[in-house]
Regions:
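N-terminal accessory segments
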Residues: 1-32, 51-66, 285, 363-388
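Short, surface-exposed ligand-recognition loops at beta-strand->loop->(often short) alpha-helix junctions
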Residues: 2-4, 215-223, 268, 309-321, ...
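Structured catalytic cores of enzymes that bind and process phosphorylated ligands/cofactors
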Residues: 22-23, 29-31, 39-41, 61, ...
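Glycine-rich N-terminal segment of FAD-binding domains in flavoprotein oxidoreductases
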Residues: 25-91, 98-102, 107-110, 114-122
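Conserved glycine-rich FAD pyrophosphate-binding loop
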Residues: 40, 57-58, 69-77, 81-83, ...
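A conserved active-site cap/scaffold subdomain adjacent to cofactor or substrate pockets
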Residues: 217, 227-286
Length: 419
């Protein structure tokens, strides 16, 4: 791609959208794109895609700028922000479904749904700033994944702009397109490499009447994981998070591992279920605003400062042993087989590579996998953020990319195997 191609593309996009809708990148966006376009509808996105294909200009959806800023080592030419596409298209309270544009943040959507006693129970860190498109593209989920699942579990429809500016829809009665792809599963976690998500439909849940949080200390990680497993068998928990000592200290439990679990329901249900929580040694129970504050702190828990942070996924029964064998600081979504692990302090490149290799070896031994979430700037370009899948799987993924994006304009080099 030449500078002339970029200049032609920028001029064409300014004419299509208006000069005020094309701007310089802000903060994290500068690590993702050289300029940013802010379309107001799917038709404008389609026009942008056609320009990019004609001029061979790469574009990146910027809803997940925080995630992309970690993965992408060099910015693409054009970032597409969906901040102006933030409308609720349809909300059916009786059916407990909602359709919304991809630029709407999860926080804004849930404030509107709360008027009807409903919510979309997905809870990534920083949900107030997390756009729905980013939620899907990066497959983000938090503590509530234990009870409510991940975006893939609540998504019932998706609309996106793909190759040649075509608008494609899947969901409802149209579960698969004519090529046989399950579009909802394909687009969730695709990191913007197959198209630009413009609209999504979700099933909703009622807001719980009451909420009780339990925090219990443990001398050993294995004891905390065993207690979490017993609780998961006994109760319909909202979440069951196990924290290593560095993170447990932020909740007032220094030098120990902590299990933070929660239940929800009406008053009689909560009182009945509290009996199982009280059986934990040293447990403290919290209700009302204090319980809510604990959950919010848990949801938005950050690892910073960390040289490397990664997400580990194994079978639920293997998670505790795998995390212990790694020996890093961690937060684990017990019962789900998912944990985030991190290495604090400073580390050189050789040490970083050795650490990541050791983490990945432990994940493979537990029949799991590991993805780097963040790394210090000096390390970021030198590390493989994704595990290498088996050759047959990678070949299938490349074929999927070629079918959806033959021109290679959608966020290239930002996924598994450089896809």
């Amino acid at each position: 791609m030449s500078d002339a191609s970029f200049d032609r593309a920028e001029d064409a996009i300014r004419r299509l959208l208006g000069a005020e809708a094309v701007r310089a990148p802000r903060e994290r966006e500068s690590r993702c794109a050289r300029i940013v376009a802010e379309p107001c509808d799917a038709e404008q996105i389609a026009a942008i895609v056609r320009v990019c294909e004609a001029e061979r200009i790469a574009l990146a959806p910027l809803g997940a700028a925080r995630t992309l800023a970690e993965i992408r080592h060099t910015p693409v030419m054009l970032g597409v922000s969906l901040a102006r596409m933030d409308r609720v298209v349809s909300h059916e309270p009786e059916d407990m479904t909602v359709i919304a544009e991809a630029g709407l943040t999860l926080g804004a959507l849930n404030r509107r749904l709360a008027e009807h006693g409903q919510r979309l129970p997905l809870d990534p860190r920083g949900l107030g700033e997390t756009a729905l498109g980013a939620l899907l593209g990066a497959a983000q989920a938090g503590p509530l994944r234990l009870s409510e699942g991940t975006p893939r579990d609540l998504l019932i429809g998706v609309r996106f702009v793909g190759r040649e500016g075509r608008t494609v829809q899947g969901g409802g009665r149209v579960v698969k397109n004519v090529a046989g792809y399950d579009l909802m599963k394909v687009m969730t976690g695709s990191f913007g490499t197959l198209g630009v998500i413009v609209e999504a439909a979700f099933k909703l849940r009622p807001i719980p009447e009451g909420y009780t949080a339990a925090v219990a200390p443990f001398a050993r990680a294995s004891s905390a994981f065993a207690a979490a497993a017993r609780l998961c068998d006994a109760l319909p928990l909202l979440h069951a998070e196990v924290l290593s000592p560095v993170l447990a200290a932020r909740f007032g439990y220094p030098g120990v591992f902590a299990l933070i679990a929660a239940i929800a329901g009406n008053a009689p249900e909560l009182e009945y279920q509290r009996g199982s929580l009280r059986a934990l040694d040293g447990v403290a129970l919290f209700d009302g605003p204090r319980a809510g504050a604990i959950y919010e702190q848990l949801r938005d828990l950050e690892f910073a400062p960390a040289a490397i942070a990664a997400q580990l996924a194994t079978a639920p029964g293997e998670l505790g042993r795998c995390v212990e064998s790694i020996g890093a600081e961690f937060r684990a979504h017990a019962g789900c087989g998912v944990a985030q692990i991190f290495l604090g302090g400073e580390v050189d490149l050789a040490g970083a590579r050795e650490t990541v290799a050791r983490w990945r070896s432990a994940a493979r031994a537990a029949k799991g996998h590991l993805r780097i979430l963040a790394a210090a700037p000096a390390l970021r370009p030198e590390l493989d953020f994704f595990d290498a899948p088996p050759p047959g799987v990678l070949n299938l993924m490349r074929r999927l990319k070629a079918a959806f994006d033959p021109s290679g304009v959608f966020n290239p080099g930002c996924f598994v195997g450089g896809i």
